[in-house]
């Protein structure tokens, strides 16, 4: 069973977070941008988002953040929450957990979200007033991914494509 580490203000970001960011940075940024838009729509504006699936540049179908939350809701018996958060000089670091009570699985995820986000082609940085909400949602998303069986995710992708058409 995973153990939790609480990071105090001033601690370095865990190496795994740095490694994840280093792998496929562009694909990661595209996925993050898509998820950030949905976080704002879903959690802050309370809009209904029908797009649960999208196709990556590698031509693979994957779930959006909305799709992951919907899969957790339909799977049932998934408890999700925020364990810890801290504000650093330039970002939020949020730790979330997910418990699959049916299968007795537990996972934690840590996400770092910068206060400033690039805008447009020039990449000038502007203050992101939703950075804390984004960090929470991304941490929950990452925790949920590990406690629901992969075959269930795949069957839900097929169902979402059939019912909602998905985003290509």
Spell out what each predicted region is.
Residues 1-168:
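Polyanion-binding surfaces on beta-sheet-dominated domains and ring/shell assemblies
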């Amino acid at each position: 069973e995973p153990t939790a580490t609480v990071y105090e203000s001033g601690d370095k970001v865990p190496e795994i977070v740095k490694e994840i960011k280093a792998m496929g940075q562009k694909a990661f940024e595209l996925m993050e941008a898509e998820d950030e838009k949905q976080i704002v729509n879903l959690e802050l504006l309370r809009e209904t988002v029908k797009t649960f699936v999208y196709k990556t540049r590698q031509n693979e179908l994957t779930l959006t953040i909305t799709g992951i939350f919907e899969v957790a809701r339909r799977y049932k018996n998934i408890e999700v929450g925020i364990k810890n958060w801290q504000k650093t000089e330039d970002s939020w670091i949020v730790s979330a957990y997910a418990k699959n009570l049916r299968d007795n699985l537990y996972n934690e995820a840590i996400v770092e979200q910068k206060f400033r986000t690039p805008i447009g082609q020039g990449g000038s940085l502007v203050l992101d007033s939703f950075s804390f909400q984004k960090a929470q949602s991304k941490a929950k998303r990452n925790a949920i991914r590990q406690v629901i069986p992969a075959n269930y995710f795949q069957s839900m992708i097929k169902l979402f494509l059939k019912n909602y058409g998905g985003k290509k």
